[in-house]
Each structure stands twice: as structure tokens, then as C-alpha cells.
A protein has these predicted regions:
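A short, N-terminal "cap"/entry segment at the start of jelly-roll beta-barrel domains
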Residues: 1-43
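Beta-sandwich/jelly-roll carbohydrate-recognition scaffolds of carbohydrate-active enzymes
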Residues: 23, 38-42, 64, 76, ...
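Conserved short histidine dyad/triad with adjacent acidic residue
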Residues: 44-60, 105
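Short, solvent-exposed loop/turn segments at secondary-structure junctions
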Residues: 51-52, 73, 107-109, 126-130
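Short, conserved beta-strand element in jelly-roll/cupin
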Residues: 60-75
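A short hydrophobic beta-strand segment most commonly corresponding to one strand
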Residues: 102, 116-133
Length: 153
């Protein structure tokens, strides 16, 4: 492990986030600013993403901005029919080093690593606005409901 990892781990500012359906490593999160931020409106973390998302759209509990530092990923976002507001496909855009991405808490996406190569990002999250979930058949499904069903299938 790196010196940075060891220091952050000793300070209690590191968290390994497992894939919520398989339990395998998904992301290494380092709390650069605050670990517990109930009283503060934003936070800054360093993410090392080591696994692609499952290929299903999800949103986040907060708006965010991320800057790709190393590596990159394909970001899949919904392609929406402007007349019916229904999702009719996906946009797939490469996000490489230097890319800056901003999203509200209600915007959907999923991330696909390129050849399973890790990606490092600086991640700025705003205040929590809502619970997060997944988009199934053009309907929002709470993350706990989706993940419970995903584990049993």
C-alpha cells in the first residue's frame, strides 16, 4: 500500500466500499476534508474506482462535481425523448484525465471502466437532498429495494 493510503487509514479517513451485490471491492474512498459532515454543506473525497457500476442508471443523494485525475471511464447517461420524457436509449461519453463532471442529485448515470483499469477522481459532494436509487422501467426505485432484489436474483 502507498504512504498516502497508510496515513489516511491510520487517521480513520479511508473507507473501502464494496460492490453492494457481490461484495467485491468497488471503490476506495479517502476523506480529504471531513469524514462526518452532518453540520457542513459539502465534502471533498478522493475516489479510486476499481470496478464498473452495474449497467443500470442510478442517481445520488447529493449534487456533485468530480474531476478525473488518473485513468478514466465511460459515463452512460439517459437519452430522453423531449416530447414523451421517456428514456429511449443511452449516451456513452469518455471521461478522461482533466474531465470535470457536474451532476444534480436527480440526474442518472452509470460508470464503465475502460478495460477494468482503475480511475482516480477528486469528488466534491454537496448537501444530502434525498435518498438515492435506480431507474427501472422509467421509474425511480429506492436503493435498498433494488439491492435487496439484486442480491436474491
Amino acid at each position: 500500500m502507498s504512504f498516502f493510503h497508510n496515513v489516511m487509514n491510520k487517521l480513520g479517513r479511508y473507507r473501502l466500499i464494496p460492490d453492494r451485490t457481490t461484495g467485491s471491492d468497488y471503490m476506495h474512498r479517502y476523506y480529504i476534508f471531513l469524514k462526518d459532515r452532518n453540520w457542513f454543506p459539502f465534502n471533498v473525497t478522493l475516489h479510486k474506482i476499481v470496478r464498473s457500476d452495474d449497467p443500470i442508471m442510478h442517481d445520488h443523494p447529493w449534487g456533485f462535481m468530480t474531476i478525473i485525475i488518473k485513468g478514466g471511464y465511460w459515463e452512460h447517461t439517459p437519452c430522453i425523448n423531449p416530447h414523451t420524457k421517456e428514456i429511449v436509449g443511452e449516451n456513452k461519453v469518455w471521461r478522461g484525465p482533466g474531465s470535470i463532471i457536474m451532476r444534480t442529485s436527480t440526474e442518472y448515470h452509470w460508470l464503465e471502466l475502460d478495460d477494468n483499469k482503475p480511475t482516480t477522481t477528486l469528488f466534491f459532494m454537496g448537501p444530502q437532498k434525498r435518498d438515492w436509487g435506480f431507474l427501472l422501467n422509467n421509474k425511480w426505485v429506492h436503493n435498498e429495494t433494488y439491492l435487496k432484489n439484486a442480491k436474491t436474483n
